[in-house]
A protein has these predicted regions:
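Carbohydrate-binding surfaces of carbohydrate-active enzymes
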Residues: 1-269
């Protein structure tokens, strides 16, 4: 209590990582009703992105469309299948004004009534995300496809949006096999003062997704941490709190100038 100061504000470096994670129950219910494949689970898909963001020590707020997006340097909408043109316009303005938007597979494929658009698949987001066209594939349990991102190869078999990018859109990752070998898996474009990244592939281990999101932060000039999975570091009212939810002892880096009030850098389970 003696160390508390009501004037404390979130450190600038931490605030620069802040991200809003967009979630809607109607979207969740509809996708669980029509999963398309027994390997798709909506909530684990969302949790995967939440967990990788927490490993960056990024402040994550789970928000609804009612919130003002402009307060977040980064915004992610995982598998946001149900939307309308109004939401796409809000996303577009957010990006033009300097926000960094991340969309993932299955986003925008249906309207608010869960009807396919009378247009190409996910047509409302094409201009925003820099997509010319897309279709999707998913593989059986026993077969894994491959994606090349940077110098690494990643396995997938849950879901793949196969993307044809529009002119001016950068391709960050491509499918390394199947009949669409060489097609885009992850695309990225600049729009106004901000960026849009579309991650078309869903993997089991999330390693591809983690490296893509890490690059989004890096391209934006925002440093991230790399906490072990299951270790969470939070900030509130001037205090950092580190929690270890794993079964093993974990070590975290603590600045030399920090004052340790409770515990140590060695976190017991």
């Amino acid at each position: 209590r003696a160390a508390y100061d009501k004037k404390n504000r979130m450190p600038k470096q931490l605030a620069s990582r802040r991200i809003g994670l967009l979630f809607d129950m109607n979207n969740y219910w509809e996708m669980e009703f029509q999963r398309q494949t027994d390997q798709w689970w909506t909530m684990p898909h969302i949790h995967k992105y939440y967990n990788l963001l927490k490993s960056f020590a990024a402040p994550v707020d789970v928000i609804s469309e009612k919130e003002d997006f402009s307060g977040y340097p980064f915004l992610i909408a995982p598998a946001y299948q149900l939307l309308d043109n109004n939401l796409v316009e809000r996303w577009t303005e957010y990006v033009k004004n300097g926000g960094h938007l991340i969309l993932t597979c299955r986003t925008g494929q249906k309207d608010r009534n869960a009807k396919l658009w009378e247009a190409p698949l996910a047509a409302p987001i094409h201009q925003l995300a820099g997509i010319n066209s897309l279709y999707y594939d998913h593989l059986p349990h026993s077969l894994y496809g491959k994606v090349d991102f940077g110098d690494e190869e990643y396995a997938w078999n849950n879901w793949a949006d196969v993307l044809t990018p529009a002119a001016g859109t950068d391709v960050w990752a491509v499918y390394a096999d199947q009949f669409y070998k060489g097609a885009a898996s992850v695309i990225h474009r600049r729009l106004g003062k901000g960026t849009v990244t579309y991650i078309g592939t869903d993997t089991d281990d999330g390693k591809l997704e983690k490296e893509v999101v890490r690059r989004v932060y890096k391209e934006a000039g925002v440093p991230t941490e790399d906490l072990p999975y299951g270790v969470v570091k939070e900030w509130r009212d001037g205090f950092y709190i580190a929690l270890n939810y794993t079964s093993d002892i974990q070590e975290i880096a603590i600045p030399d100038e920090a004052e340790m009030l409770i515990g140590s850098a060695r976190l017991e389970p």
